[in-house]
């Protein structure tokens, strides 16, 4: 079995990230940014990009907002894989969580998921995220405000799950 590799993303990866964001159905679940927005995020010092590779082929990405913030809270802003349903997203998520907790002082990682996105929610729960509540109208997608289920994982729970 080939292993997945999580690597730090760079400006050279923007084309792949944008292509993945534009896969059918992803705009409604993941969102998408322009090239200028991605370049600005990469340059602002607040965001960290990660690419997941399988046999030297890019198959997914994640964007973390507030990487190494002084508040010690990181947000998984966006995460996606090119071919869902193969378990790669869950592996990407688990590796990303490990990376955040081992490379930063983060105490809490949180994310928002649309309540109807059962596949993503199951993956988040499998890695240890817990639902905290509904953030009403917190996401503006396709000209509509949408609710998001806030899920989070705190360092003590992550540490306990590793033992």
Where are these regions (language model features)?
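Acetyl-CoA-dependent GNAT
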Residues: 8-12, 18-84, 90-93, 99-104, ...
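Conserved active-site alpha-helix within GNAT-family acetyltransferase domains
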Residues: 90, 116-133
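Conserved beta-strand-loop-alpha-helix junction that forms the acyl-donor binding cleft
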Residues: 111-121, 137-142
